[in-house]
Amino acid sequence: PLSGQVYYIQYNVCQEDPALPMEDFAAQVQADLEAGGYSRVLVDLRNNGGGSDGVIWPLLSVLRQEMDDGTEVVGLIGEATFSSAIINAVELQEMGIPLVGEPASGSVDHFGSVSGFSLPNSGIQIGVSSKYIDLGTLLEAGLGAQVEPLVPTVLVEQTLDGYLAGRDTLVDWLLANG
């Protein structure tokens, strides 16, 4: 928790943690939210460079239940939000969750589903996108964005002064404007 009423989730990679699978993590979050009486949940995707977009689905289910019970959920995005994390951010928008922060570094529609192979003579590993992801055809929240960067509902930039002082300008803004 960031304050008595705000619960913070930092989601930095779209990949299962063998030590804490997403199903277990989502159940832990649900138990915390039920026990804590939180009025707001922040889901931070700002440092998430992607992975597998479906990993977050158990958590989205918990967030949907919390929203139905009156809890406000806010998504945080920024320059390091990329690939599958952009898909997750658009999924948050699709649920009616506002995004706050800075524009993401990747576009809403993008190449993804990376497949790998080794070069035969050197053994160097290569990753190649194998699919074009057109979110506008999958999610209403992605309509019209095409290859434009994902932009937040509310633009709040990290300031240099805040950074140098070790302050998270976006979280400070959200706590002050809750």
Where are these regions (language model features)?
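C-terminal "post-core" interaction segments
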Residues: 1-178
